[in-house]
């Protein structure tokens, strides 16, 4: 019987570190190929390879996905206005398909026989990874250790890691599960599982508490071209650099802390804490520029598309014809979304200070209540009569019955 060659989505965290040892025990003689994708998360890159090899991996691959993540995923979601259940900017959910694709690419190049991930059996990520695997490599076997192994808690995993000299940062006193990329951070587990418990200060990874944020606000100008942010305070920037800078400015001012109860793909509700400074700022700015530049029916209908797009991302069906079809619609809507938005960042809040666009549909002469008003007030009488004619007729027939 041939030995398995297993491609592992490796983060260096508790689950994937324990997983390498567990896979080698379960599949005797298996060759483990560890694959780490860089989505802009803070990590000790130099330590990942020796850690993976010391844990039992035969080889290690590090793939820089940051530019692709921004241009092919984040900007698409931003243009669509994709906020899951009106709150979550989908940082983790957006990152999973591109990580899964990178794992598939390495697995195919290395001749692997199996794909594996470190997702729990009650979370969303198992769906996102495995649906992507099925979309891109339907012939490959998939194993999900966290659905099979004997550990029933993170505390048991920590004990196992300590017993087998597996280096991990999680401790029984600090049991948070944290996932990070350039678009945001998700924090769960521990005391956060009680929805009545306020997030402890140590749960937050990058943002300053709004109460401790600077007393002087930060004002930023963000330029967009066809829905994509291209400049900050008048300086042209690559997408990656712009997001990094806004994360820094937002975090400093306590912007981007989110606490929500969300509906998971698998049918349960979960309490999630997110930090997403840049995403919060950019979604706010983009939405305000759309208010200025989009025709009324497009603006209102696009809100429905944004929810559909968010569901596609959250539910793990990124590599689908439906997502591609929605991209085509969104791209048309974004043609006029060019201009500048000025914002104030202050103690956890994002406040609109101004917006301008060469494609603005705001006509001050029509909107003003001064002598410069050019709106035809006399036309309103006939418009109202026709606009309300249906309800008037209905009431004449039905009132008094």
Swiss-Prot record:
EC code(s) of this entry: 6.3.4.5
Amino acids binding ATP: 9-17, 118
CDD domains according to UniProt: ASS
GO cellular component: cytoplasm
Reaction(s) catalysed by this chain's protein: L-citrulline + L-aspartate + ATP = 2-(N(omega)-L-arginino)succinate + AMP + diphosphate + H(+)
Residues given in the record as L-aspartate binding sites: 120, 124-125
Main location: cytoplasm
Pfam (any one): Arginosuc_synth
GO biological process: argininosuccinate metabolic process; L-arginine biosynthetic process; urea cycle
GO molecular function, one term: argininosuccinate synthase activity
UniProt-annotated location(s): Cytoplasm
Binding residue positions for L-citrulline: 88, 124, 128, 177, 186, 262, 274
InterPro entries: Arginosuc_syn_C, Arginosuc_syn_N, Arginosuc_synth, Arginosuc_synth_CS, Arginosuc_synth_type_1_subfam, AS_cat/multimer_dom_body, Rossmann-like_a/b/a_fold
Pathway: Amino-acid biosynthesis; L-arginine biosynthesis; L-arginine from L-ornithine and carbamoyl phosphate: step 2/3
Annotated keywords: Amino-acid biosynthesis, Arginine biosynthesis, ATP-binding, Cytoplasm, Ligase, Nucleotide-binding
Record-annotated membrane-spanning stretches: none
SUPFAM superfamilies tied to this protein: Adenine nucleotide alpha hydrolases-like (SSF52402), Argininosuccinate synthetase, C-terminal domain (SSF69864)
Family designation: Belongs to the argininosuccinate synthase family. Type 1 subfamily.
Subunit structure: Homotetramer.
Stated name of the protein: Argininosuccinate synthase
Lineage: Bacteria, Pseudomonadati, Chlorobiota, Chlorobiia, Chlorobiales
């Amino acid at each position: 019987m041939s030995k398995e060659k297993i491609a592992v989505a490796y983060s260096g965290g508790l689950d994937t570190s324990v997983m390498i040892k567990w896979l080698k025990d379960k599949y005797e003689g298996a060759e483990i190929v560890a694959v780490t994708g860089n989505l802009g998360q803070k990590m000790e890159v130099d330590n990942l390879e020796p850690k993976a090899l010391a844990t039992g991996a035969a080889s290690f691959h590090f793939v820089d996905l940051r530019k692709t993540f921004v241009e092919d995923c984040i900007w698409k979601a931003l243009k669509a206005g994709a906020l899951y259940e009106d709150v979550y900017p989908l940082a983790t959910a957006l990152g999973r398909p591109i990580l899964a694709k990178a794992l598939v690419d390495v697995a195919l190049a290395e001749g692997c026989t199996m794909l594996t991930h470190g997702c729990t059996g009650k979370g969303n990520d198992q769906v996102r990874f495995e649906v992507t695997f099925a979309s891109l490599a339907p012939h490959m076997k998939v194993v999900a250790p966290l659905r099979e192994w004997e550990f029933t808690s993170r505390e048991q995993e920590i004990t196992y890691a300590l017993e087998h000299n597996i280096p991990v940062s999680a401790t029984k006193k600090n049991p948070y599960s944290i996932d990070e990329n350039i678009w945001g951070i998700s924090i769960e587990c521990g005391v956060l599982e009680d929805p009545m418990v306020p997030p402890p200060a140590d749960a937050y990874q990058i943002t300053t508490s709004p109460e401790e944020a600077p007393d002087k606000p930060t004002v930023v100008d963000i330029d967009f071209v066809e829905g994509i942010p291209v400049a900050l305070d008048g300086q042209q920037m690559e997408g990656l650099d712009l997001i990094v800078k806004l994360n820094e400015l937002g975090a400093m001012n306590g912007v981007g802390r989110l606490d929500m109860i969300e509906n998971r793909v698998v049918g349960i509700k979960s309490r999630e804490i997110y930090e997403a400074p840049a995403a919060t700022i950019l979604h706010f700015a983009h939405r305000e520029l759309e208010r200025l530049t989009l025709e009324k029916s497009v603006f209102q209908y696009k809100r429905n598309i944004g929810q559909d797009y968010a569901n596609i991302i959250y539910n793990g069906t990124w590599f689908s014809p439906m997502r591609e079809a929605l991209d085509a619609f969104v791209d048309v809507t974004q043609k006029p979304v060019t201009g500048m938005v000025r914002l104030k960042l202050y103690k956890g809040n994002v406040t609109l200070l101004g917006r301008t666009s060469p494609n603005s549909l705001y006509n001050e002469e029509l909107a003003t209540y001064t002598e410069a008003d050019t709106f035809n007030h006399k036309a309103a009488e006939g418009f109202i009569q026709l606009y309300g004619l249906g309800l008037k007729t209905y009431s004449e027939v039905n009132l008094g019955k």
